[in-house]
Amino acid sequence: MASNTIAQSPSGAIHVPIDQGYEGWTEKFSRKFKENPWVPIGCVATCGALIMSAVKMRAGKSTDMNYWLRARVVIQGVTIAALVAGSMSLQAQRKKVEEATGVTEETKKEREKEEFESRLRGAQAAYEEEAALAGKTVKGPTVKRHVHPETGAQEREEETVERKAATLAGRQHPHPVAPVDKKPQEG
């Protein structure tokens, strides 16, 4: 699946690049654990304290239950502090990496603008090509009306691109000429 290369900055912080493709939950967990290991450890400790308080409550030991509930609150607070500190250090680390590689917001915006303009030029060229081809194609069927020489009934024939191609190839088109209900006008 995704292969992440872990880089360590001079400050000692670990930088794990994020792939643009699909990242499964195991890869995401391992990446997040490597970025900030205190958060998952704190979550496990919080769950452990909550389970211990439930066990003590079932045993009828209310003082021990209160101890584990207070421990859960403290551990949860430490976990949240680790989460905030980790996100702040990651933000500072990413800023350092951007400065080191020279990729800043301005260069990102310029690159996106250039990519957009190149796609726009390609779309305009395709539009002009389609417009040039549209002038050379047949636009819809042409209708011919004529009077049948023997019966005098007026008939109509639609010439479509398929019918013209079939006529040129010497075949008969699968749809015959459709008669029109109007009688010939004399005059």
Curated annotation (Swiss-Prot):
GO terms for cellular component: mitochondrial membrane. Residues 10-101 form the HIG1 domain. It is found in: Mitochondrion membrane. Gene3D superfamilies: 6.10.140.1320. Its main location: mitochondrion. It holds the Pfam family HIG_1_N. GO terms for biological process: mitochondrial respirasome assembly. Associates with the respiratory chain complex III/complex IV supercomplex. Belongs to the RCF1 family. Cytochrome c oxidase subunit which plays a role in assembly of respiratory supercomplexes. This is Respiratory supercomplex factor 1, mitochondrial. It comes from Laccaria bicolor (strain S238N-H82 / ATCC MYA-4686) (Bicoloured deceiver). The lineage of its organism: Eukaryota, Fungi, Dikarya, Basidiomycota, Agaricomycotina. The gene is RCF1.
